[in-house]
Amino acid sequence: CQRQAVIEAVSKSVTKEAANGFCLITGDSDEVERLHPAIKGVWGAQTSGANIISFNLSAFNSWGKEQGANAPVGKHSAFAYTTALNSLLSKDSRQRLQIGDASTVFWADKPSPLEDQFADIFSDPPKDDPDRNARAIKALYEAPRQGVAPIKDNQTRFFVLGLGPNAARIAIRFWHVGTV
């Protein structure tokens, strides 16, 4: 809107340096992260890293807010999610799969054997144990016949996140939450 009265009203109600705000991740009041750390390891994204949350043009600003204030995430939460994703997306991670153009990561909210079995089912078998994938799938198929659950834990939450390249940003392709 270009009306002067609206511009003045918005300017008065918004501070340029909104140091604190409500974090969209935790819901708690926290110092808002202006620029989020880069996430590396997403196939097809820039090798120097890319962001899930970023605003690089003034056209993306809303209600007079700039950069991170448009999607407020606390400094602690921004550090936590980017550090966790960088770890999950690292080359040596067994919790990372490539599904089409989506770099897919998965984890449980507490230690669970499913984290290893999930990778065994969907990834290429290791050269030193080419039958590992077959054993993991066999265990899943034999469990109902034997009358036991392959993993006896329906309280542990399990997360699957698919990330895809989108110019200088990272797009969330899919997000699934279930139980082990």
For each predicted feature, which ranges?
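Extended alpha-helical scaffolding segments
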Residues: 1-10, 30-180
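Short metal-coordination and nucleic-acid-contact micro-motifs, chiefly zinc-binding Cys/His arrays
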Residues: 15-21
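Short Cys/His-rich metal-coordination motifs, predominantly Zn2+-binding knuckles/fingers
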Residues: 26-28
